[in-house]
Design a protein with these regions (language model features):
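Flavin (FAD/FMN)-binding glycine-rich loop and adjacent Rossmann-like elements that form
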Residues: 1-182
């Protein structure tokens, strides 16, 4: 919906970028917006994540007026609150009995022990301010093997979602919540 408007925003913090809005409506009329990319955050450091949240909150002073002025339908937007945690898409994955690869995804491979079927596009976020995210493929349907949920050397544990045994590129598709719920 608002990709062009997002890319036109010039953040005060040079280590941020506004991307297309992900919008979720709530029953009370509020909307949740996921659109600010915060670069330079170490997802394994609580201090770095806290600094990222503080930087994002400081950016709201400039971002909210920009949204009101440039995003049709948001002329009366008000900030109710910001997220208490950062959404970190990529950090680390378990080493499982099988690692789902980008070839598995793009070649629509079946697996003998499939536990779910994925079809979400391979959506890769930028990792630096000089680059933009991209969709590198749109699979028809691929199988997620049970083996990719089973960590090596750990008993009685299954790992689903973005931390399962996927390569980073395969996770661009397999990370989505519906697959983890399947």
């Amino acid at each position: 919906g608002y990709t062009e408007e997002g890319y036109s925003y010039e953040p005060q913090d040079e280590m941020m970028r506004l991307r297309g809005f992900n919008i979720a409506r709530q029953n009370n009329g509020n909307v949740l917006i996921n659109a600010l990319i915060i670069f330079g955050v170490d997802p394994l450091s609580e201090e770095s994540k806290a600094e990222g949240i503080a930087r994002a909150q400081a950016e709201m002073e400039y971002l909210i007026p920009y949204i009101r002025e440039n995003f049709k339908g948001f002329e009366k937007a008000e900030l109710v609150k910001t997220a208490e945690q950062l959404y970190v898409r990529e950090s680390r994955h378990i080493i499982g009995e099988y690692q789902l690869t980008i070839d598995d995804v793009l070649e629509n491979r079946d697996q003998w022990d499939k536990i779910a079927i994925g079809a979400y596009p391979v959506d890769v976020q930028p990792t630096a301010t000089q680059t933009y995210g991209t969709v590198i493929g749109s699979p028809d349907r691929y199988a997620v093997p049970f083996r990719s949920l089973v960590p090596l050397k750990v008993d009685n544990l299954l790992v689903v979602g973005r931390s399962a045994s996927y390569t980073s590129l395969a996770a661009g598709s397999a990370r989505v919540i519906p697959l983890g719920m399947a």
